[in-house]
Amino acid sequence: MVRKAVIPVAGLGTRVLPASKAIPKEMLPVVDKPAIQLVIEEAVQAGIKDIILVTRSGKEAIENHFDKHYEIEAELARKGKTAILESVQNILPDDVTLMAIRQPEAKGLGHAVLCASAAVGNEPFAVLLPDVLVDCEDGEVHDLSQMIENFTQESATQVMVERVADEDISKYGIADCS
């Protein structure tokens, strides 16, 4: 069973400048949550228990978001704002661990995943890219859950790809699916 996820978050966010100049792109809001939280929520829903962020300096806001914030929690409790207090306290379930590993230098996505190898060990794991959010069409089975199920049944590596226009090929990693 896949219980670990590696989430590379060490990028510079150049595709979303100027929005990412002062805020990590993974922390940009999608309605009322940062994008990284949506990615981690999908991972948790799929059964992931160990989340490994591969990060760099300047990305501390990501780790801070998933940490306890006692001052905010105390203030919300004092004001009786229980609904928002619960949402703040439940950002990361108690049975899920989150760790951060630094990528010492920018050598690309493959290197970022390699930086997590000691934490992953010899276990199967998922790599989640937090700058691409995919909405579930049927509203029930999320892509990661389906990929983990396929991996468990087939014992074969799973890769999700998306078609892009020819003029956008230089912006993405490319897979030839022919």
PLM feature segments, named:
Residues 2-81, 98, 103, 139-146:
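N-terminal glycine-rich phosphate-binding loop and ensuing alpha1 helix
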Residues 71-75, 82, 88-177:
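Conserved beta-loop-beta/alpha segment of the NTase-like Rossmann-fold superfamily
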